Amino acid sequence: MKRIAISIRNRVFVESILFMLKQTGEFHPVRLPSVWPERILIECRSIQPEILLMDVTPAQPETTIEGRLKMLEKLHQEFPECKSVMLCDETAYPELAQDVMHAKQSRLIDGFFYASVTTGYLVASLSSL
């Protein structure tokens, strides 16, 4: 079973993802209670996830792409094998969606999804990481 840590602010969205991941029987998903980088690192030390799924928004400095990438740099120092996946709303934030795509192209992250992704595709893609 793959351990996956989820740092997504939207409660409805994260609950839907948790439900779908649990249904497959392939994942042990854990919702991280905070978006603060220090708290994410502390939680990840406890969970030791194989995948970290995070949302990216311009709402808070911690959830911007810059904030998330900075946190991932620290995370990968401790957990180099942990895959990092970002989720963003391509309709509300088209420029941010482009930045996330460029982060993947630059190999700063292992994967990304847009908010319009179906849960089936999300689960299948995470299984393949």
Please provide the spans of the model-predicted regions.
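Extreme N-terminal starter segment of soluble prokaryotic enzymes
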Residues: 1-4
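Conserved sequence signature across two-component system core domains
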Residues: 7-8, 52
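Two-component/phosphorelay signaling modules centered on CheY-like receiver
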Residues: 11-37
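Acidic, metal-coordinating helix/loop segments flanking the phosphotransfer/catalytic sites
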Residues: 34-51, 61
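Conserved phosphotransfer microenvironments
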Residues: 52-75, 91
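Alpha4 helix (beta4-alpha4-beta5 surface) of REC/receiver domains from two-component response regulators
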Residues: 64-66, 70, 83-111, 120
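His-Asp phosphorelay/catalytic-motif detector in bacterial-type signaling
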Residues: 76-83
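C-terminal output helix
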Residues: 114-126
